[in-house]
Amino acid sequence: MSRPADPLRSVERRPLWQAQLPPQPDRRARPLPDVVDLAVIGGGLAGCAAARRGAQLGARVVLLEAESIGWGASSRSGGMCHPGFKWGPAELMERHGAILGESIYRESVDAFEWTAETIREEGIEAAFVRSGHLQLAVAPSHLEHLATAAASLATVGEAARTIRAPELRDEIGTEAYAGALVVERSGGLDPARYVAGLAAAAERAGASLHEGVRALRVRSQADGRAVVETSAGPVVAREVFVATNGYTDGVAPALRRRVMPIGSSIIATDPLSEDLAHAISPNGRMFFDSKNFLYYWRLTPDRRMLFGGRASFWPSSVDRTARILLEGMLRVHPQLAGVRVAYAWTGKVGFTFDRMPHVGRLGGVTYATGCCGSGIAILPYLGHRAADWILGGEPAPALASLRFPLVPAPYEGRPWFLPAVGEWYRLADWRAGRERPQD
């Protein structure tokens, strides 16, 4: 008897979104301007949004991207777009006071709505849908925490509720969870098309975008301006905005000591039949679970299962993480057994010690960083707001009021301590998985 074919037998080791992106303009070998009002370092979502807004304000803007537009996390994510942070509204108000805490949360809501409006305004074909999402409880105790989260969201007017396991059948084709938090203000998009659309919008507004140009160092001049030294020569700028997130290197040493690059991996299957896709996700929701080593998944616009997670805190190959994710996907959705995995890839997520995004000024530059796994809405919005702040004289975002903590360990950009942290999280997830269901 022949063995079943390996689902990973012919996987492409690149992001699905990049593979499906139409050809883009060649932005390499363009001459750099000598002097600008705003130099943006990083050509992802935050950088392109800042460049667009700066140019709209009439500034001379140059964007410097070491690889290609959207090459990093901006085109490697699951494409899930939603308000909120690790901490809900009630926790934010407890930590930062009622006024600031609520303002911070509402910025995340504004970011989601700004995303939808920008896509509409610029005519970006990013397959944006308002689908809502489910956070699935791996244990009964987690469902209790999710009920608290639903109550917290209700205090700021968000439509959220919890459902128990029997009700899950109307939302998802799995019996692996104890229940879920359902949040309606949420959605999905194609992140590669979104960042490409923001880049095109920035160019239409007058920004100059350059690929294959690595920023090496930023130094201050006596006249208050900065010199950005690059692999293609220097640029003098009145303001510098750094938007490198999980790919931050020596160009911004102060940020590098505050942002930890953590790997996240994704697989995507061949397109599913309409019947199988509907059985798995009848309402087209975005999904993620309540573990520390969480899984997140969704159906893509062409009905592929996209399944991701932090498969390991140890250095791992794409093939190894793809195998781990395949096993996880089949535990959640055994009906996908035998479906071929077509794409597998990894990327770096920028995490901060307080698990919050940050925007502000540090070491002579302005920055927006720390997506913490939920950056599609908030980071480009912060890029937009940062340009308004430093060029247009608008108030700083509420998030700029937060102290940006250093990583409390000897750390210069290589998170050597993550494997030990990961094992602690894995043990907590194992214990949660052993809880008995409640009657």
Segments (PLM) and residue ranges:
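Extreme N-terminal leader/targeting segments of oxidoreductases
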Residues: M1-L38
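Helix-loop-beta segment of a Rossmann-like dinucleotide-binding subdomain
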Residues: R27-R28, E125-Q135, E167-A201, A205, ...
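N-terminal Rossmann-like FAD-binding beta1-loop-alpha1 element of flavoenzymes
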Residues: L38-L63
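Glycine-rich FAD pyrophosphate-binding loop
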Residues: Q56-R76
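Dinucleotide-binding Rossmann-like beta1-alpha1 core, especially the glycine-rich loop
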Residues: G84-P166
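Active-site substrate-recognition segment that forms the wall
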Residues: E113, E121-V129, A215, D223-R225, ...
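Helical element adjacent to the flavin cofactor pocket in flavoenzyme catalytic cores
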Residues: E144, A151-S152, A178-R238
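C-terminal catalytic lobe of FAD-dependent flavoproteins
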Residues: F313-S317, A322-E435
